[in-house]
């Protein structure tokens, strides 16, 4: 038997057969079927969507942001690859109603054509592929908290931008350093309603422990925790293989922010029929850009890195890893410090 009795996970009554069906179903209904008005039912009026680029509060603001994205990418498709989820304790729940609450981590791959002007500049006609990872807290068929990481590095590279150059251009188009939209930082957070951390499943705890050890400088854990042939899907829509690539990625991030505080926020592990054991971890780095690494010359800029990682496990350890952070939001924070 799987670790989830799917008959228990019926958010919003019996329309949805389980939590993955709800998350994938409303995503298609909103974005592809153009039922943007349904956001008023599926998203709470005071809920917050936090992304590395900003924080958006309230379903009306989410509708506006959704319209802007669809106007720029009218043929956008959102293909759900996985939804990792767990029930939440009554004491952790916010949102409406008195039903069972859920935390979910949705991994999807998007396809789109940059065919209209918008946030990404004049239309390039380029075909895009990129991932999103999103953690949502829901109850009674309504999402009341969300943390979303979009692979902006992949989007801007495929359009023809370097992430740093795009961040500089965006600051200018938004009115300069004083007037531009400020990237998300914990000090800007508000309307936090979900207070839990996920579940205690061993797979999730192992994944979180590996991340903690790497961020503490114990890069040697990669040899024991990762499959030698690990498949990696990384920011910039980069695909890599092997332990050396995992070491290069995680060391390049940590060495850029060697003194930053690393924190685990959500951890879930899950085992289901037809799936490998898998996990989802939402994490962050907060501190100074004080080292040489993936983000160039140290600047001393205060930076918050919002990250989400999914992992799948096999007989030889972590065999597939999907990790996202937003390179453009990191560069924007650095450039706001350095000019």
Residue map of PLM features:
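C-terminal and inter-domain tail/linker signature
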Residues: 1-339
């Amino acid at each position: 038997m799987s670790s989830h009795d799917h008959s228990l996970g019926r958010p919003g009554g019996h329309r949805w057969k389980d939590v993955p069906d709800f998350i994938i179903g409303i995503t298609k209904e909103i974005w592809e079927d153009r039922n943007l008005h349904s956001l008023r039912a599926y998203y709470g009026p005071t809920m917050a969507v936090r992304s590395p680029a900003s924080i958006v509060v309230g379903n009306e603001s989410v509708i506006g942001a959704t319209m802007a994205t669809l106007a720029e990418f009218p043929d956008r498709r959102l293909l759900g690859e996985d939804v990792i989820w767990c029930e939440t304790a009554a004491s952790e729940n916010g949102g409406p109603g008195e039903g069972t609450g859920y935390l979910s981590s949705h991994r999807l791959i998007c396809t789109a054509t940059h065919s209209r002007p918008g946030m990404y500049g004049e239309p390039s006609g380029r075909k895009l592929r990129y991932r999103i990872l999103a953690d949502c807290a829901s109850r009674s068929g309504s999402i009341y908290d969300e943390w979303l990481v979009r692979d902006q590095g992949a989007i801007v590279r495929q359009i023809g931008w370097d992430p740093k150059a795009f961040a500089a251009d965006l600051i200018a188009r938004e009115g300069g350093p004083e007037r531009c939209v400020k990237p998300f930082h914990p000090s800007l957070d508000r309307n936090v309603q979900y207070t839990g951390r996920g579940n205690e499943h061993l797979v999730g705890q192992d994944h979180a422990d590996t991340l903690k050890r790497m961020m503490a400088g114990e890069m040697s854990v990669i040899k024991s925790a990762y499959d030698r042939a690990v498949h990696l899907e990384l920011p910039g829509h980069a695909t890599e293989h092997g332990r050396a690539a995992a070491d290069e990625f995680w060391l390049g991030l940590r060495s850029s922010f060697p003194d930053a505080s690393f924190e685990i926020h959500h951890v879930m592990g899950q085992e289901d029929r037809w799936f490998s054991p898998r996990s989802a971890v939402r994490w962050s780095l907060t501190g100074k850009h004080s080292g040489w690494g993936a983000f160039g010359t140290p600047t001393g800029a205060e930076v918050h890195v919002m990250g989400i990682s999914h992992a799948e496990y096999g007989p030889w350890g972590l065999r597939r890893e999907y990790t996202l952070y937003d390179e453009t939001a990191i560069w924007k924070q650095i450039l706001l410090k350095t000019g």
